[in-house]
Amino acid sequence: MVKIRLTRGGAKKRPFYHIIVTDVRSARDGRNIERLGYYNPVAQGAEPRIVLDVARVDHWVGNGAQLTDKVRNLYREAKSQAAAA
């Protein structure tokens, strides 16, 4: 099964997450199929908090990929930001 989930990057006390498509059997920071965007929970100033390719997420969900709970919330937020812009 394929999932869209977060993989951690960044430094200690300064997390940064990539939003990726991966097989559920892969490790958190292991092999991925495609990188769809990123999430920066500690963004400051003009830095974007979420950058996500909504069209590619829709493509993967249409092909049977499942979103994790956190990615689902980020997807909704990115979609509403795109509609507002």
Swiss-Prot record:
Q: What does the UniProt keyword field contain?
A: Ribonucleoprotein, Ribosomal protein
Q: Which GO terms describe its cellular component?
A: cytoplasm; small ribosomal subunit
| Gene Ontology molecular function: any one | structural constituent of ribosome
InterPro entries of this UniProt entry?
Ribosomal_bS16, Ribosomal_bS16_CS, Ribosomal_bS16_dom_sf
Spell out the Pfam families in the cross-references.
Ribosomal_S16
**One GO biological process term:** translation
Matching entries from Gene3D superfamilies are given as: 3.30.1320.10
Which NCBIfam families has this protein been placed in?
A: S16 (TIGR00002)
Q: Which PANTHER family match?
A: 30S RIBOSOMAL PROTEIN S16 (PTHR12919), SMALL RIBOSOMAL SUBUNIT PROTEIN BS16M (PTHR12919:SF20)
Q: Quote the HAMAP family the UniProt record gives.
A: Ribosomal_bS16 (MF_00385)
Return the similarity comment.
Answer: Belongs to the bacterial ribosomal protein bS16 family.
Q: What is this protein called?
A: Small ribosomal subunit protein bS16
The top of its lineage is: Bacteria, Pseudomonadati, Pseudomonadota, Gammaproteobacteria, Lysobacterales
The UniProt gene name for this protein comes to rpsP
